[in-house]
Every structure is written in C-alpha cells, then in structure tokens.
Amino acid sequence: MEEIDNKAEKRKDADIMKKYKAVFSDIDGTLLNSKHQIPENTRKKIKQINKNGIPYVLVSARMPKGMTAIRAELEAKSPMICYSGALVVDEEDHPIYSVAMPQEVAMKLCRRVYELNPKISVNIYTNDEWLVKDKKEYWAAQESDITGVIPQEVSFEDEEVYKEVHKVLCMGDKEDIAALEQQLVKEFPQIRIYRSKDTYLEIMSMKASKSDAIHMLKDHFHVKQEEIMAFGDNFNDIDMIRYAGLGVAMGNAADEVKPVSYTHLRAHETGA
C-alpha cells in the first residue's frame, strides 16, 4: 500500500511540475521547521524540481548572507529575493533589483525608536551588510545564531550608515514591540511596518514587496504569472501567495494567511 501511495504522490508531483514553471518559497516557518532545518522529504522534492530545470527561488525577510547557505544546501542555482522584496540578487549574488528607504526617513526612524524605547534592539540592513551598535547585545546575538551571520558594529550617529537602507529590524519583548509598532505606524505612514513575529518588527520602503520582486523575476525566467507557485506562512507572504498562479499556505500559517491561498498544507514540520 505504501508503494502505491508513493507512486501516486510522484504522479501528482509530476503533473504539478508540468503546469508550473517557477517556484518561490519563504524560508522561516515554511521551508525550515522549528529547529531551523529543512525536512528530508522537502529536500528531496526540491532537488527533483532543480533536476527538472524549474527555478526554485528563496524569498525571505533575511539578508543575502542569511540565505546563501540554504540555497547551496538545496543545490539551487537561482536568484534570491531578500528583505521581503527590497533587494533581489542573481545567481552570483549581484544586486539586480533594489528598493531602499529614503536616507532621511531611515535616519529619523532609527533615532525615534531609541527615543521611544532604548531597550529595543535596532538593526540596519544595507545590501549584504547587517549593522548594529553592539553585536553582543542579546537580540542581535540570538539573530546571529539563527542566521549564521555576524553583524558589523557601527556608530548610528554616522549619516553614511543610512545611505541605502533596505530594512530596519527592531527586536524586543512582545509588549515593547507591539507598543512600538502602534506608535511608528502613526508617525511614519510613508514606510511599510509590520510584525513578522511577536518580537520582531520589520520596516522597509512602502515600494518593496515580495510580489513586485516576483513580478520582476517572472520576466527574467520568461514564465507567465499563472505558471508560478508560491509557498508562505506569514503576513508578509500574503501578497506573493495572492500573486502566484498557485498560492500555498503552510499548515502552520497565520489564520489571516490561509484564506488568501488556493490551498494549504499540513504543518511544515512534516516537510509537506
């Protein structure tokens, strides 16, 4: 019976891959399980996708350095969508699409965060650099352990730091982050502000989105919108799930995400 089930699943996968010509996947909570690992079943399916010549593109709020090891593990040779669409790099990690925050806005924002709550960890991402005041600070050290990237210490008084900011990440206790979000949304309506989880507040240009970055790569791959598959689990995945020909929400997806998807899978722990 198990052999029959496996054959049926393989036929189903083959039929799907005939229809869809590019796959875009979020990383945390989608591709990776709670141990920040790729389930073996998922790994096998992605390697088969690669063998079929179908681009498998990682899409994340992460910086490029936080994604390259995962791409290498999957043996994928595709561009990557970073900072939730604010930066796209090609197969050689060269920037091919960039949407940065205005310098004055980024500088004013970061200074305002410290005024509102000095306990908040402020992290600036510019191209493939992660800038912090203190890399030994609790939240920065924890993020470094998760992503495998070591931040660079700089003075936030230096205006050059804000020259090409793709993302600002604020980390802290969930109560502090909730209060910060509420205040910043009022004061900075011209930029995109959202919580990727209770303790993380992501901030970037209003012009940056995962769906816009996918739209650009659609032309790069010479595929149609209806030939695109997208997998996600969180609020910042909603626009790409809606955009894709087949949008899939993971079983662990937020309740607000599942209704916008065509279908949803069982929890990401299983690798399905």
Where in this protein do the model-derived segments appear?
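Active-site phosphate-binding/coordination module
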Residues: 35-139
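Single conserved hydrophobic/aromatic residue that forms the stacking wall/gate
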Residues: 264-267, 271-272
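Asp-based phosphoryl-transfer active-site loop
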Residues: 21-34
